[in-house]
Each structure stands twice: as C-alpha cells, then as structure tokens.
C-alpha cells in the first residue's frame, strides 16, 4: 500500500498510481510537497495540495494535512468503494450507515469490502 512516487510528477500521475494500488495508499508529506513543487509545507501549501488532490478525485487522511515532511498520509480515490466507505465514516449519513453495515455484515459487500473497512477503521482510529 505504500505509494512509490519516484516517477510521479503530476497529480494525474498520482491518481494513476492510486488506481494501480487498489484505489488506496500511503505516502509521506515530503513526497506531496515535492509533487507540488513547493519548498516548505506551510499552511497555504498544504491547503493548495489538498485542493489539487480534491480536483483529481483524491481524498486524504488525516483530513488536515500535517506540516511535517516526514508525516505519513493516506490517499484514496473518492468515487470508489474504498472512498465511499471512508466518506461514510467521516461524513455520516443514512446511506453511509447502510453501506457500512453492509460491508461488515456481508450484505451488499464482499470480503474485499470488509477488509477495506477494517483497514479504514484502523486508520481513522489511529492504529
């Protein structure tokens, strides 16, 4: 799940890397800073990175990007099953509740969805 961004030079390339890694992965803030062609991870740069990720359909955890270049972040494609599960956890709705229950109970979800939900619970819980 670690994203190797050695050859990635654009946000579109980052999106492609996520697709190759099952729509989810983790990387360091220093790599995102470099992708953004910034020198530092100040508040404005972090906000711009978040906006650019969003423009490409990429979500991130934690919701507020950290300013430490060594901090690890999780990236996911928003309009995918894993993205929908993460959104269901972070932005509760009735539909999201049904999605979560279905993912863990086997109703409306498969084993892969249940495993992704387990991973999401670990990430959101900080474990």
Per-region residue spans from a language model:
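Generic secondary-structure transition motif, activating predominantly at the C-termini of alpha-helices
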Residues: 18, 22, 36, 53, ...
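Long, compositionally biased intrinsically disordered regions
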Residues: 1-2, 82-127
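Extended alpha-helical scaffold and adjacent linker segments that couple domains
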Residues: 2, 27, 36, 56, ...
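Charged low-complexity interaction tracts in eukaryotic proteins
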Residues: 54-95
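Positively charged, polyanion-binding regions of nucleic-acid-associated proteins
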Residues: 5-30, 34
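Charge-enriched amphipathic alpha-helical scaffolds
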Residues: 13-14, 33-34, 38-67
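Residue-level signal for secondary-structure boundary elements
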Residues: 22, 26, 44, 57, ...
């Amino acid at each position: 799940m670690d994203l190797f961004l050695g050859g990635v030079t654009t946000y579109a390339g980052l999106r492609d890397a996520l697709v190759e890694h099952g729509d989810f992965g983790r990387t360091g803030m220093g790599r995102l800073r470099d992708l953004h062609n910034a020198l530092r991870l100040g508040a404005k740069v972090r906000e711009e990175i978040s906006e650019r990720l969003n423009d490409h359909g990429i979500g991130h955890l934690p919701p507020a990007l950290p300013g430490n270049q060594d901090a690890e972040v999780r990236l996911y494609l928003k309009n995918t099953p894993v993205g929908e599960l993460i959104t269901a956890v972070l932005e509760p709705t009735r539909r999201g509740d049904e999605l979560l229950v279905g993912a863990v109970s086997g109703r409306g979800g498969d084993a892969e969805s249940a495993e992704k939900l387990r991973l999401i619970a670990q990430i959101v819980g900080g474990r």
